[in-house]
Amino acid sequence: MRIFRCPRCRAEDISADAHPTRVLDNGVERPVFVCRACYRAAELEFRIASQTADLGYVPLGIRDGLRLLRDFYRARLADDEGDDPRVRSALAEVERRLAIDAI
């Protein structure tokens, strides 16, 4: 089983517990996945970078974040030589939440 580390702190395994956020890379918004402990700080860094670059900060929508997570977990399952039950469980939870329609 491959381990995917948080790109911010490099300490936590985010294989089955990732949190979507974004970074500003030369003026281009790029999605990244961080651990639970780094999420707020990473989102604050993105907000500050957006405001500094005069791009305007728009929070990541819940459904957009869930779609990013779904793609992340699907890629983990496709890359993984073994079938990790934690990743499969996380993917099932994300797909369940995506299936719920907005009221």
Language model features with spans:
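The identity of the second residue at the extreme N-terminus of proteins
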Residues: 1-2, 103
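Short recognition patches in nucleic-acid-associated and regulatory proteins
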Residues: 2-28
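Hydrophobic beta-strand residues in large extracellular and virion-surface proteins
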Residues: 6-9, 33-38, 94
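Generic alpha-helical hydrophobic packing signal
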Residues: 12-14, 41, 74, 97
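Short metal-binding segments enriched for Cys and/or His
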Residues: 32-54
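Short, intrinsically disordered terminal segments enriched in charged and Pro/Gly residues
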Residues: 46-103
